[in-house]
Amino acid sequence: MGNVVYKLTSKEIQSLMAQTTFETTKLPQGMKARTRYQNTVINIYSSGKVMFQGKNADQLASQLLPDKQSTTGKHTSSNTTSIQYNRFHCIGSDEAGSGDYFGPLTVCAAYVSQSHIKILKELGVDDSKKLNDTKIVDLAEQLITFIPHSLLTLDNVKYNERQSIGWSQVKMKAVLHNEAIKNVLQKIEQDQLDYIVIDQFAKREVYQHYALSALPFPDKTKFETKGESKSLAIAVASIISRYAFVKHMDHISKKLHMEIPKGASNKVDLIAAKVIQKYDIQQLDTISKKHFKNRDKAIHLMNQKYNK
C-alpha cells in the first residue's frame, strides 16, 4: 500500500472536497475529513495535510491535485519550462466552471500566432482569474472575432449524466480539451503550429488515458501549470472559456429570478436551498453539479428549516 502526503491551502482543500463526498463527523482528533474513493483512502487533517493511502494513491492524487507536489518526495516537478511560448505559433487550452457548484463546464482552445501577440498585449489579455466579469466579457467579445478558437460547453444535465456513469471531472476535461484542440486544428494551417499548450489539470499520462482519442501532435504538446501566465494562447483560452461560463451563469440567474453565485462556498449552499424551496430539487439538479457536497448541505438546510 502506497502513501502520498500533500500540504494544501484552505482553498485547495475546499476544491478537493468538492470532487467527492467526505465524512466530516465522528472523526479522530486532528482529522478534518475522510473518504474512500476509487479504492484509495483520503484523510484530510486540521493541519492542512492530506494523505492518500492505497495501491493507486499516487495516480489518484495526481488526478485530484494535478498542480501539487507531494511532501513525501515521490513527485519530481515537470512543470518548469524554458520555452518562451509567445515567440511561437501556439494552440492553448483552458477551462472554467470546474470548481463551481452552479453552472456548466466550459473549455476553450485558441490559436495564437506571433502576429497576434502585439494586439493581444495592447488589449490587456491576461489570466482571466485576475479580471472581473465585466472585463472578461469585454475582452472575449473582441477576441472571438479574430482568434481561431473552439468553445465547448458541457451543460449540467450532460455533466451529471456522465458523472453518474463513472466519468470523473478529470475525464470530462480531458475529452473536452482534446476535442477543442482538434477543432482548432481544422481551422488553421497545421504547418504553422509550433506547440499545443494545455493548462495542466492532470499529468500527461492521466490526460492521455482519459481523452478517448490520441493527442493530435504528441511531440508538440506541453502541459503547464499556471499556463495562462506562460502563454498568451492559454490566456486567451482562459478568457473565452470564462466568458462562456459567466454568460451561462447570467442566463441561469435571469431564468430563476435570483442571483446565482459562483464557487462552492456556504453562500452557494444557501442559494441552492432557496432554489429547492422556490422550485424543487429537480430544478436544482439541472443547473448544478450533483456530486458536489453543496447539494447535500442545501438539502440539510431545508430539512432543518421544516423540522423546527
UniProtKB/Swiss-Prot annotation:
GO terms for cellular component: cytoplasm; ribonuclease H2 complex. Its EC number is 3.1.26.4. It comes from the Bacteria. The keyword Metal-binding applies. It is found in: Cytoplasm. Pfam families: DUF3378, RNase_HII. Its cofactor is Mn(2+); Mg(2+). Manganese or magnesium. Binds 1 divalent metal ion per monomer in the absence of substrate. May bind a second metal ion after substrate binding. Keywords: Cytoplasm, Endonuclease, Hydrolase, Magnesium, Metal-binding, Nuclease. The keyword Chaperone does not apply. InterPro entries: RNase_HII/HIII (IPR001352), RNase_HII/HIII_dom (IPR024567), RNase_HIII (IPR004641), RNase_HIII_N (IPR024568), RNaseH-like_sf (IPR012337), RNaseH_sf (IPR036397), TBP_dom_sf (IPR012295). It catalyses: Endonucleolytic cleavage to 5'-phosphomonoester. One of its GO terms (molecular function) is RNA binding. GO terms for biological process: DNA replication, removal of RNA primer; mismatch repair. A divalent metal cation binds at residues 94-95, 199. Residues 88-304 form the RNase H type-2 domain. Belongs to the RNase HII family. RnhC subfamily. Endonuclease that specifically degrades the RNA of RNA-DNA hybrids. NCBIfam families: rnhC. This is Ribonuclease HIII. The gene is rnhC.
